[in-house]
A protein has these predicted regions:
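Hydrophobic side chains within alpha-helical segments
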Residues: 8, 43, 108-111, 127
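General small-molecule cofactor/ligand-binding pocket signal
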Residues: 32, 78, 139
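Acidic, PIN/NYN-like endoribonuclease modules and their adjacent C-terminal/linker elements
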Residues: 1, 68, 113-142
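Short glycine-enriched loop/turn motifs at secondary-structure junctions
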Residues: 24-27, 71-72, 114
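Active-site neighborhoods of divalent-metal-dependent phosphate/nucleic-acid chemistry enzymes
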Residues: 75-125
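Short, well-structured N-terminal submotif of metal-dependent ribonuclease cores
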Residues: 1-40, 44, 48-61, 134
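Active-site-proximal, substrate-binding regions of enzyme catalytic domains
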Residues: 42-91, 133
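Residues at the C-termini of beta-strands that transition into short coil/loop
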Residues: 35, 81, 142
Length: 142
């Protein structure tokens, strides 16, 4: 099982830079992500629609593909538990002031750590640099 953040999940459906490498990695194992990654993923597609990067018909196809894959169990969506939220609070208590960590990225990192993952895959430099504060190794194949 491999933990992907949303920046990697989007590349499974949209031809952003590095999509081929991410898809090859995804084909090698089952995928997991924090449950809120579903909202982040469709929000990323909506942003592409809003920015004019995709047309409404393509947007509808993307959303349909995501829904079909979710219903088929293509991803393990990990719900946020009290333990995950506690871990986030504790991480921020100890986090050096120099570390830039968004709340949604902290949810990814704490979810991965509490679920027993040792690595997280992302293209987000802030998430990758903060991974060590959750006992994780951040990896990027792009």
């Amino acid at each position: 099982m491999i933990y992907f953040d949303t920046s990697y999940l989007v590349r499974l459906y949209y031809q952003d830079p590095g999509a081929e490498a991410v898809r090859a990695l995804a084909a090698s194992d089952h995928l997991a992500c924090a449950a809120h990654g579903q909202a982040e993923m469709v929000a990323a597609f909506h942003r592409k629609l809003r920015d004019g990067a995709i047309r409404p018909a393509s947007y509808a196809v993307l959303i349909g593909q995501v829904e079909a894959h979710i219903k088929a169990g293509a991803f393990r969506w990990i719900p946020q538990s009290a333990e995950i939220l506690f871990r986030i609070r504790k991480a921020y208590e100890k986090l050096p002031a120099s570390v830039f960590l968004r709340a949604a990225d902290a949810v990814h990192l704490a979810t991965a750590a509490e679920s027993g993952f040792r690595e997280v895959y992302s293209n987000d430099l802030h998430l990758l640099s903060a991974a060590k504060h959750f006992g994780l190794v951040g990896k990027n194949v792009i």
